[in-house]
Amino acid sequence: MPHKQINDLQAFGAHAPRGALARIIQAARRAPEGWAGRRAAYFLRALGVRALRGRPADVESLGARMRLYPADNVSEKRMLFTPQYFDPQELAYLGQRITADFVFVDVGANVGGYSLFVAARAGAAARILAIEPQPEVHERLVYNVRQNDFATVKTLECAAADCDGEVTMFLDSRNRGDSSIRIVPNHDGGRLTVRARRLADILAGEGLDRIDAMKLDCEGAEDLILEPFLRGAPRRLWPKVMIVEHMPDRWSMDLPGFIEAKGYRRKLRTKHNLIYERDGAESLR
């Protein structure tokens, strides 16, 4: 089994990039779009990961301070070295809709990329709920939230699912972001039991009365979460915008068809995600 990463909770700045590593990060972040730019950025990124030798790096990314561990999490690697390539279409779409009192629910929050992106652009009246079931990844999420002064992000350590109780999570130790409550192709990191709650129960417990946007990145468990939610939750809690990871090979139903039958329009398909907007969302506020 691959080496398990241990989180380092020292004060922010203890792992600030210096010297050659800092120059590699700067160069990778300046790489443009296009085939040649991406090839250069990915080459630099690989050099940087090797230079870190499993250590984290303290940087600003997506408008927030984060401690990122690129060795075992692809999302963290992207945010550290190439944030310009980190879901740019999704974040642009989301960014255009952020208001001072934005309500955002991040299901499968990982270490907080989306949640902190929203927090950096919303006002003090915003509410951001970041849900992450993996204990080690949740610990990184909490650390990153605490390095910023937003005071609008709340984290929950649980899995959103189709039941309340406990579920088995299958771990991919090479990419913590690929772990799932559905069996994953490379679950060489073993498995663990995590707390599970229905999404509707989570939101009710938080006292939310609306959701402006929700992101679901659950490595193939999106249907398990959304199907019971859209069947049973009050319509006032249906998100105006949904960003849903596109993993049809793992779903047990036609999730896009189900979502569209519930009154959502697909606005965009990107490399990894589907973006939906609820019919009439523009007039709901």
Go through each PLM region and give its residues.
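Phosphate/nucleotide-binding beta-alpha loop and adjacent structural elements of enzyme active sites
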Residues: M1-R285
